[in-house]
Amino acid sequence: MRVVIQRVKGAILSVRKENIGENEKELEIISEIKNGLICFLGIHKNDTWEDALYIIRKCLNLRLWNNDNKTWDKNVKDLNYELLIVSQFTLFGNTKKGNKPDFHLAKEPNEALIFYNKIIDEFKKQYNDDKIKIGKFGNYMNIDVTNDGPVTIYIDTHDINLNK
């Protein structure tokens, strides 16, 4: 599992409105956060629940904010901030051959949706239902992000030994 975590002052996620023509570009906002983290989540075809729990723990507990006296001392929960979790299979785009990305390492969409929903439920269970916002799985999304720092962290559970 891969996650790109960005510390943000705000993020707005929009999708194309339902019931409009294919050529229309009108968007509607479905998720918005103020201070917090945007987490772009890629699910590998071989990911397990242990991978998910590791990513959830890191997203909720990484100390990415300063305290009055210490740097890198507070996490999203300490500050009662929000998270926007966005499924992004393109994190497993392989570009080793040619110029067209190959996404065969990403989990199959139907299976990924079930796993993603379980991950979101666990985020809400471990933190606060009202503080977890999501994108729309499998849809085109427009995301406006105001980075804070910038602070960007990349985690790949396949780089870590999770008792595999």
From Swiss-Prot:
Q: Which InterPro entries match?
A: Daa-tRNA_deacyls_DTD (IPR003732), DTD-like_sf (IPR023509)
The GO cellular component terms are: cytoplasm
- Per UniProt, the short sequence motif C-terminal adenosine nucleotide of tRNA occupies residue numbers 104-107
Record note on what altering A112F does: Loss of deacylation of D-tyrosyl-tRNA(Tyr), loss of deacylation of glycyl-tRNA(Gly), not toxic upon overexpression
Superkingdom of the source species: Eukaryota
Instruction: Give the location in the cell.
Output: Cytoplasm
List the catalytic residues: T90
MF terms (GO), sorted A to Z: D-tyrosyl-tRNA(Tyr) deacylase activity; Gly-tRNA(Ala) deacylase activity; nucleotide binding; tRNA binding
Q: What is its EC number?
A: 3.1.1.96
Keyword hit for Endoplasmic reticulum: no
This enzyme catalyses:
glycyl-tRNA(Ala) + H2O = tRNA(Ala) + glycine + H(+); a D-aminoacyl-tRNA + H2O = a tRNA + a D-alpha-amino acid + H(+); D-tyrosyl-tRNA(Tyr) + H2O = D-tyrosine + tRNA(Tyr)
Q: Which family does it belong to?
A: Belongs to the DTD family.
Oligomeric and partner information: Homodimer.
Additional notes on this entry:
In the crystal structures with bound ADP (PDB 3KO4, 3KO5), the adenosine moiety is thought to represent the authentic C-terminal adenosine of charged tRNA and is annotated as such in this entry.
Protein name as annotated: D-aminoacyl-tRNA deacylase
